[in-house]
Amino acid sequence: MMQTKVQNKKRQVAFFILLMLWGEVGSESIQYSVLEETESGTFVANLTKDLGLRVGELASRGARVVFKGNRQHLQFDPQTHDLLLNEKLDREELCGSTEPCVLPFQVLLENPLQFFQASLRVRDINDHAPEFPAREMLLKISEITMPGKIFPLKMAHDLDTGSNGLQRYTISSNPHFHVLTRNRSEGRKFPELVLDKPLDREEQPQLRLTLIALDGGSPPRSGTSEIQIQVLDINDNVPEFAQELYEAQVPENNPLGSLVITVSARDLDAGSFGKVSYALFQVDDVNQPFEINAITGEIRLRKALDFEEIQSYDVDVEATDGGGLSGKCSLVVRVLDVNDNAPELTMSFFISLIPENLPEITVAVFSVSDADSGHNQQVICSIENNLPFLLRPSVENFYTLVTEGALDRESRAEYNITITVTDLGTPRLKTQQSITVQVSDVNDNAPAFTQTSYTLFVRENNSPALHIGSVSATDRDSGINAQVTYSLLPPQDPHLPLSSLVSINADNGHLFALRSLDYEALQSFEFRVGATDRGSPALSSEALVRLLVLDANDNSPFVLYPLQNGSAPCTELVPRAAEPGYLVTKVVAVDGDSGQNAWLSYQLLKATELGLFGVWAHNGEVRTARLLSERDAAKHRLVVLVKDNGEPPRSATATLHVLLVDGFSQPYLPLPEAAPAQAQADSLTVYLVVALASVSSLFLFSVLLFVAVRLCRRSRAASVGRYSVPEGPFPGHLVDVSGTGTLSQSYQYKVCLTGGSETNEFKFLKPIMPNFPPQGTEREMEETPTSRNSFPFS
């Protein structure tokens, strides 16, 4: 609650505290004068000289002349810097009877905002003659009236003021009367007729005089009225009022017909000579707001009163008896001010569009006024509390509306401000004026991407100019400051040919692949994109784009072993005594793709004899499916299909030649089994090693013996033991010697040994027979018994 009161005090400015902030205005008010009715365009003053400004400063700072009510009595010539009359001025219309007639105005300069107080005095010329309300006045005077008796006459009116106004009255030459010029309290002059010599009805029953009103102009102007005087018979008594001066106070909002006051007069005569009737004297039918009842003397309102126009009235009341004699009294009616006028607000300067980020800007300059008086004239100016604006008093009744601090268009782009002017009368009256202030944009926000990094995917073998994705950035500014242009930034990797890989649409951020991408050559790359606005200076930001090339199944499996290059296929030897599951060979293949496109599966596509051999689907091992017999053919041709897991799948085939050999014993290569239990005793490991060494020695001796016997019996055999005879060249870099299970040209087998006591696992040694010449005769082989019987182990 306390905080709200403090804010209200900050926002409200009492009009009656007239703070003269001379830091913003000139230290003195400059005064100019001009005669009324002067032609428009007449030179009044040179502002540059009078204000002490540099030449051209008035025009560059948008000088303006501001009068109350936005009436333009003067105009500013931006070329000559002269102040000229904008129209003919009528002093009587502008100020009435008020003298001097001064019109205050302000010279308003912008950039920065500055006030200069000035005033224009309109001097009167004698353009009006005095004028009586009636061309003829009637007076009835008893012949027994003593000399020195004064008879008030109706006054003349002159719209001019000062020396040009009404100055005196004269009367035509006569022996009975002279005229006096009297002053009223408000300064107006009225005539009084003074009797100098007694009247005689029998001698002259009627007189006609001319009353002349003269002003002080040069030459003087005058007005006349005829006075007709009727001399009456003896009548001892004239009507007399109870008071010579009556006073009344009337609120300005009294209704029409309401009673103002009642005057009364009596006549001591009897009969018709004692009957009194009332009338208003010095009646101005245009401005007179009162009427009187001729019988009762009640004075009532016939027109509405307005304190702001006339604050008091001087009324003369005349009482006339039946004999024509009259008496007069004066009535002063003071009009009481009522708070019947709401404050007025006049906007002199207003900027509807203000830039953001400036600490303090003058938005509007306005003046306030209230036609009431006293307490009813005091006003308070205020705006809403929740706005970043302040009201500051300027000069006299002027106020400036300024920003409280820098505004942010992105937070709020428009403000509706209601200026409230409230007077302190009872009841309080107020005036409101709403203005709309829009905040113009300044380029203070860089574009912001919707994501700090983008990940895009494109499948390889794409068509050139393919739209692969988009980046998007927004700018909180508006207009041209919010227009974003996209670009590719130089890559951090100098070897990345970014300009030949992708491009970006500068207007919408769409990204395009410029050429077909190959996953096998380039799986992914990163680059940066920039977003720049079109403000001045331009602001920018950047984002990281990661492009991932998706693999397409565009590579068929490639068979490494056995070699499928069009040369003569190699032959695998299998002893007829081989057990089911005997490893014949292993098809080794690779796929240049990745992921599931590189997952290979194997299957036996063709075989000379179905059911004799089988292919493991996942590793390509070719094994015997059953026991061999003498009835099985000696030569077999197997076609193994290698297929990837792509969509659609791609495949390749490998052709194998298998030769069944009688009486040739080979070590049984069992299927992979689970490792022995870890809990076996260490002593068992020692026994297994000794047993394995004995069996291996016996097995090696048996093999050598078997090979020697077979070579003797089969002179046409081209090789001894289990080996592959390549009938064509086989590239050395494709031989699998890493223990993957692929059979090379040399015959391979594994000897199972146990490891250390810690593992209780078997290890396998791989004796490898050196390659034999692809062609040879039994005689040549007999000449090299070392080759036949040598089985080096590695």
UniProtKB/Swiss-Prot annotation:
It is found in: Cell membrane. Residues 773-794 are annotated as: Disordered. Glycans are attached at N46, N183, N416, N565. GO terms for biological process: calcium-dependent cell-cell adhesion via plasma membrane cell adhesion molecules; cell adhesion; cell-cell recognition; chemical synaptic transmission; homophilic cell adhesion via plasma membrane adhesion molecules; nervous system development; synapse assembly. Keywords: Calcium, Cell adhesion, Cell membrane, Disulfide bond, Glycoprotein, Membrane, Metal-binding, Repeat, Signal, Transmembrane, Transmembrane helix. Residues 710-794 are cytoplasmic. The keyword Transmembrane helix applies. Forms homodimers in trans (molecules expressed by two different cells). Forms promiscuous heterodimers in cis (at the plasma membrane of the same cell) with other protocadherins. This is Protocadherin beta-6. It comes from Homo sapiens (Human).
